[in-house]
Amino acid sequence: MNSYVCVVGAVNLDICGRPSRKLIFRDSNPGTVTLTPGGVGRNIAHDLRLLGAEVKFLTAFGGDSHAQLLRNDCVELGMDLGCALDVPGGRTSTYLYITDERGEMQLGLSDTDISAAITPDYLSRHLDELNGAAAVAIDGNLTSETIAWLGAHCTAPLFADPVSVTKAERMRPALGALHTFKPNLTEGQNLTGESSPEGVVAALLAQGVQRVFLSMGGDGILAATRDETVHLP
C-alpha cells in the first residue's frame, strides 16, 4: 500500500493586527501584530501530519524572508518539501487583516498571486510522485487550468477543498475526476444551482464526484456516496 499523501496547494503567512482599544480608522492604533503560518493546502498537510500520515507538500515559496519562516514551519511539522517550488523574486503568499478590539475582522488584504506558479508544467515534472501517492489533496487556490490538468492526469484518488465561493468555480472542470469533495453549502449551491443540501449533494454525485462531505455550519455535515447519505450533526 502507498505510504504517503501528496498535498498540492497554498501556503501563506497570516498577519493579524488587533487594536488594544476601539479601532480608529485613518490613524495609527496601538495593539498587537501576530504572524501565523496558514494557507488551505498547508493546513490540510498539517492535519494529515497530526494524523500520522507522511506528506509530500507541493507548493510555491517566494524569494523573501516569509518563505524561510514558512519552510521552517513545514519542516518542523515533518512535511517533505522535496517537490516544492521556489520562485526567485516572487512574493510568498500573504494574508493581512485588521480586527477590532473584540477580534472581529474589519479589513483584509490577500496577496496570493504566487499560487499561479503551481502550473501543469511544474506538476508534470512530479507526476510520478503524484500518481504514486495513496491520495492527492488539492485546494481551490490553484488555477482552473492546473485543477483541470490534475483531473486529467492524476491517477491517485483526488480530494478537493474549494476554499471559497469564487474559487469553487475552478473545480468545475475536474468534478468528474474527484474521489472526495468538501464544499460548504454556499459553495455547493453556487456550483450546482441547487438550493437544498440534498439537491446539492445529488447534483455533485451526478457529475461524477464519488464522495461528498457538505458542511452546513451549525447544521452539521451531509456525507454522501451514490449508495448512502448520512447526516452528521
Protein language model annotation of sequence segments:
Residues 1-60, 65-76, 233:
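Glycine-rich phosphate/adenosyl-contacting loop at the front of the ribokinase-like
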Residues 1-6, 29, 168, 197-233:
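Conserved phosphate-binding/catalytic region of the ribokinase-like
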Residues 6, 56, 137, 158-161, ...:
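Structural detector of well-ordered beta-strand residues that form the stable sheet scaffold
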Residues 12, 32-35, 111-114, 162-166, ...:
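Short, acidic/turn-prone active-site loops that include or flank metal/cofactor-
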Residues 73-89:
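A glycine-rich helix N-cap at a beta->alpha junction
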Residues 94-98, 107, 220-224:
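Short beta-strand scaffold segments in enzyme catalytic cores
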Residues 135-199, 218-221:
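Conserved beta-alpha-beta core of the PfkB/ribokinase-like small-molecule kinase fold
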